[in-house]
């Protein structure tokens, strides 16, 4: 059986529309926190966020059942029936979210799923539960470490949950709740991610300073320590991670560095501080005057400067770092020019191809302003635009099917459209379609076709009979549409390839 917990839906922002990534990992050890693999999970955002947030998301209309009296709410939850198959439960919930018929049923009290299981307040069948999670961001590109994510996981009738987090309620289709509870439904809406990069579009996501490198540690915590602390280290630079214990060690190293004298090491020889330091530096006492103390400080400073200068002179192996770009060498310049030539040529070719492609695309999709439709193979279609391919293809195919709209007004407009194109029918059909299907850059062909078929009725019949065993199959309505007027091969239960 597939692990249903691998499929979750993020609210209010989901990484993909309409279902979440299947590779999201759940950390069952700590139900309040979890880590996601390499991407920032869904974050709860308010609609007041500006920028590309509203561009990359679509608002989906649904409903919710508020928390009623304890006994009434418990009775409604016990009467919820979605489907006995967990996979069908997920599919029906996803379809309900797409067409705005999903309902959020919140319990009367804020308890865990295990607590409600002990009380016996659970749906009759598996249902999708809404959970609140605090997810860590491992991309190192966010100014915040954790995000709030609302995700869906399957809850079994015996109280076994295939997800984790703080339980909020059940998300079920409107057909799963009893009829008497539909009078208390309230309109509600959620925002789902349409596309773009994986992760959420938050105010601090993928934002960092221009000069900040991508390191596993903070650049401000880098300190330089004495080589005497580690004789086996090749590099005297010590990288201190951003932890509380190591921060204390770093502070002690910095404090001690101000009071120590710079000491350098050479190969096979170790320089020590001369004895003149002790002789030239008198011991300070409480009876000395301020003038004497000032002279002593000046003497100590001169000795330190002399020792540091001698140490630097005694290290002939040290070479000052230089920038290779500032080196004046004709060979290096020629080599750099030869290496950059292919890249420059490729960049110029890409620019030329982009210009030609844009010009060709504009010429292909250029439509006269007075042209509103065209006719192909006896079927009418709206004028060609860059973002209405889903509309044109669906309308052309539907004209060949024997369908009738359930609404009498739409049926009259449909007959007018088939007779000689009617723009009123197109406008009314597009306006009645769910907003989750129609996008600014286009639409979903399969979802729009399914919505179109759901608005129609079919007076079609198809009979199927096996030529070997004689078993018959009678199809009606939408099932018969897919076989109407065609000779389609079909495999019978007796393993015989029969025909209509």
Curated annotation (Swiss-Prot):
- CoV Nsp1 globular domain location is 54-196
Q: Which UniProt keywords apply?
A: Decay of host mRNAs by virus, Eukaryotic host gene expression shutoff by virus, Eukaryotic host translation shutoff by virus, Host gene expression shutoff by virus, Host mRNA suppression by virus, Host-virus interaction, Hydrolase, Metal-binding, Methyltransferase, Protease, RNA-binding, Thiol protease, Transferase, Zinc, Zinc-finger
Domain Peptidase C16 residue range list: 352-500
- Name the cystine pairs: none
ZnF (C4-type) ranges: 466-494
Q: Which residues form the active site?
A: 389
Gene Ontology biological process terms from the UniProt entry: methylation; proteolysis; symbiont-mediated degradation of host mRNA; symbiont-mediated suppression of host gene expression
What Pfam families does UniProt report for this protein, alphabetically?
Answer: B-CoV_A_NSP1 (PF11963), Peptidase_C16 (PF01831)
| UniProt cross-references to CDD domains, sorted A to Z | MHV-like_Nsp1
Q: Which InterPro entries match?
A: a/bCoV_NSP1_glob, B-CoV_A_NSP1, Pept_C30/C16_B_coronavir, Peptidase_C16_CoV, PLpro_thumb_sf_CoV, SAM-dependent_MTases_sf
What are the GO MF terms of this UniProt record? cysteine-type peptidase activity; methyltransferase activity; RNA binding; RNA-directed RNA polymerase activity; zinc ion binding
Function recorded in the entry = The replicase polyprotein of coronaviruses is a multifunctional protein: it contains the activities necessary for the transcription of negative stranded RNA, leader RNA, subgenomic mRNAs and progeny virion RNA as well as proteinases responsible for the cleavage of the polyprotein into functional products.
The family line of this record is: Belongs to the coronaviruses polyprotein 1ab family.
This protein's name: Replicase polyprotein 1ab
| Species name | Murine coronavirus (strain defective JHM) (MHV)
